[in-house]
Swiss-Prot record:
Homotetramer. This is Serine hydroxymethyltransferase 2, mitochondrial. Catalyzes the interconversion of serine and glycine. Its cofactor is pyridoxal 5'-phosphate. Its EC number is 2.1.2.1. Pathway: One-carbon metabolism; tetrahydrofolate interconversion. The modification N6-(pyridoxal phosphate)lysine is found at residue 287. It holds the Pfam family SHMT. One of its GO terms (biological process) is glycine biosynthetic process from serine. Belongs to the SHMT family. Transmembrane segments: none annotated. It is found in: Mitochondrion. One of its GO terms (molecular function) is glycine hydroxymethyltransferase activity.
Length: 517
């Protein structure tokens, strides 16, 4: 008690004016810290509070500098990676708050630690807002907001609702699926999901680029899955949830919709919702939803059906899923993330958010249209959401080489497999999305410009490939270092940066940046 009293006196002993932290931003302010002499007078040797209250640029200038470099990268570059976005200042304030200090194993009202009354308030509010954001009836749906990320969230569901070696069907990874849905090759189980469960992929019709639902149904009849995943990481078309629901009903299988990439679009109501058909829905929270880096699991509750005896049969997902998350696979939740997620979910119910997601869709349509006019092939021929998957094979180049040039000119995108690829190491495509740049204020005409800059980068990659002294990626990278190509890279990078720098930064003020030039 004596030390606590002394520390309280120390915290109130200075009458100096407030100082801004984090390079003059408006995130936090605090009283200037008392001098060493005050510490020695009040409690000799107790100097660590000064270290704990020091701003980042004082306490760790090396890390502070790395953050400043990342700010500059985000400002000067074109962020086209589908799974990224720029979260809001208020979300970052919540994530960087004192909520990170508390440990809270368990659930609201049933914790294994004391002092969680405000943590309970934040988590309960987050759950309420999650249901509201997706227009769900709390009597029919519940939600767990504790999963740390999307892949663990999916594994929580498998663990909760399946037995070891039960069967799962999901979209094949090279056809746009995700690792966490149980990807394996003929010789190796890549995802841990395929170790603990038996998995079979369904695929696209390679001639159309759309999911082959007829073949999916035939495969399900033979494989008899216990769970079918409707979700993708690189599929530019809408899912036919009703069709998969019929397949699930026929097989008495659970329908898990993984909407990690599209949840922001679903929340805004600009694409169809999986909640009308799915039993369980998972999502990450930092992609199109534009929150912090976390995940959620939604599950049906209440009456499932009336049996032959006339008795109501209830869904039993809630307890199973909650127990799989904790104590099954996780310990204490990340309370700062849950608090930040609550903020993001409130934003997701606003008119501004709906307008943003509508612009995401419009931008992607324009992006796709411009790319096609420039001679690019898109998997499925176009887009119905926020992404384009470019098949580069008709350009005589692969995604790995194009990605290297894009990165050199400060365009962030990622190589991606496309149907027909024989090697994931040399994928034939590039995956790009519109959410992040739309957050910065890009509209249709800007994405026409982005498509033009992308085209210049691809043409440069083709030239470099033609001059490379070998067929390996390292030979291509070596060829990039020639003075002639470095000059072209430098010019294109300058054009990219000058265009990107016209737009607002998100979460920090341009004026406070250390590296503006």
């Amino acid at each position: 008690m004596a030390m606590a009293s002394a520390l309280r006196r120390l915290s109130s002993s200075s009458n100096k004016p407030l100082q801004r932290l984090f390079n003059g931003g408006h995130l936090y302010s605090m009283s200037s810290l008392p001098s060493e002499a005050v510490y020695e007078k009040e409690r000799p040797g107790v100097t660590w509070p000064k270290q704990l209250n020091a701003p980042l640029e004082v306490g760790d200038p090396e890390i502070a500098d790395i953050i400043e470099l990342e700010k500059a990268r985000q400002w000067k570059g074109l962020e086209l990676i589908l799974s990224e976005n720029f979260t809001s200042l208020s979300v970052m304030q919540a994530v960087g708050s004192v909520m990170t200090n508390k440990y809270s194993e368990g659930y609201p009202g049933a914790r294994y630690y004391g002092g969680n009354e405000y943590i309970d308030m934040a988590e309960t509010l987050c759950q309420k807002r999650a249901l509201e954001a997706f227009r769900l009836d709390a009597a029919k749906w519940g939600v767990n907001v504790q999963p740390l990320s999307g892949s663990p969230a999916n594994f929580h569901v498998y663990t909760a609702l399946l037995k070891a070696h039960d069967r799962i069907m999901a979209l094949d990874l090279p056809h746009g699926g995700h690792l966490s849905h149980g990807y394996q090759t003929d010789t190796k189980k890549i995802s841990a999901v395929s170790i603990f469960f038996e998995t079979m992929p369904y695929r696209l019709n390679e001639s159309t680029g759309y999911i082959d639902y007829d073949q999916l149904e035939k495969s399900a009849t033979l494989f008899r899955p216990k769970l079918i995943v409707a979700g993708a990481s690189a599929y530019a078309r809408l899912y036919d949830y009703a069709r998969i629901r019929k397949v699930c009903d026929k097989q008495k299988a659970i329908l898990l919709a993984d909407m990690a990439h599209i949840s922001g679009l679903v929340a805004a109501g600009v694409i169809p919702s999986p909640f009308d058909y799915a039993d369980v829905v998972t999502t990450t929270t930092h992609k199109s939803l534009r929150g912090p880096r976390g995940a959620m699991i939604f599950f049906r509750k209440g009456v499932k059906e009336v049996n032959k005896q006339g008795k109501e049969v209830l869904y039993d997902y809630e307890d199973k899923i909650n127990q799989a998350v904790f104590p099954g696979l996780q310990g204490g939740p990340h309370n700062h993330t849950i608090t930040g997620l609550a903020v993001a979910l409130k934003q997701a119910t606003t008119a501004e958010y709906k307008a943003y997601q509508e612009q995401v869709m419009s931008n992607c349509a324009k992006f796709a249209e411009t790319l096609v006019k420039s001679g690019y092939e898109l998997v499925s021929g176009g887009t119905e959401n926020h992404l384009v998957l470019v098949n580069l094979k008709n350009k005589g180049i692969d995604g790995s080489r194009v990605e290297k040039v894009l990165e050199a000119v400060h365009i962030a995108a990622n190589k991606n497999t496309v149907p027909g690829d024989v090697s994931a190491m040399v994928p034939g495509g590039i995956r790009m999305g519109t959410p992040a740049l739309t957050s910065r204020g890009f509209v249709e005409e800007d994405f026409a410009k982005v498509a033009y800059l992308f085209d210049l980068a691809v043409k440069l990659a083709v030239k470099i490939k033609g001059e490379a002294q070998g067929t390996k990626l390292k030979d291509f990278v070596a060829a990039m270092q020639s003075s002639a190509f470095q000059s072209e890279i430098s010019k294109l990078r300058h054009d990219v940066e000058e265009y990107a720098k016209q737009f607002p930064t998100i979460g920090f003020e341009k004026e406070t940046m250390k590296y503006k030039n």
